[in-house]
């Protein structure tokens, strides 16, 4: 569709856009952690979502008429729990798949960030996971780049 409207492929347009500098003065931070810790935290987060009522939430959405074919039901958590509710597999399997798919999503995000230019990686381990230290570092970078006065 883009090609038909503009006469150039979308890939050429995207390449041209990458070459342009942003009109904004910004810093692009990515908080990073060792993969084993990241995956452990993902597993705990999924467990927390379940404890806080993910299954009941999806049951309610299903009662309201939401179904598998809807884009809104394709999000992480919804599609796995919906498959469980529809008898596709037991809850334990739905949870296993949700954790696996969330880990895969996190891996894809990190891959995407690595391709970005001007990313400032913040390895949380180097700051002993101390949020105050991380914030102080980020503020110092912002001051260095004249983003903060």
Where are these regions (language model features)?
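Phosphate/pyrophosphate-binding catalytic cores of soluble transferases and nucleic-acid-acting enzymes
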Residues: 1-149
């Amino acid at each position: 569709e883009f090609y038909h409207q503009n006469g150039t492929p979308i890939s050429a347009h995207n390449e041209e856009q990458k070459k342009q500098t942003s009109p904004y003065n910004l810093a692009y931070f990515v908080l990073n952690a060792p993969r084993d810790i990241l995956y452990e935290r993902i597993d705990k987060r999924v467990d927390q979502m379940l404890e806080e009522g993910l299954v009941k939430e999806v049951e309610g959405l299903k009662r309201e008429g939401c179904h598998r074919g809807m884009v809104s039901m394709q999000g992480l958590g919804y599609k796995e729990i919906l498959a469980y509710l529809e008898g596709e597999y037991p809850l334990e399997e739905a949870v296993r798949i949700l954790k696996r798919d969330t880990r895969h999503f996190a891996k894809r995000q990190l891959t995407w960030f690595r391709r970005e230019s001007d990313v400032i990686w913040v390895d949380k381990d180097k700051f002993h996971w101390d949020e105050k230290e991380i914030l102080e570092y980020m503020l110092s970078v912002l001051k260095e780049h004249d983003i903060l006065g």
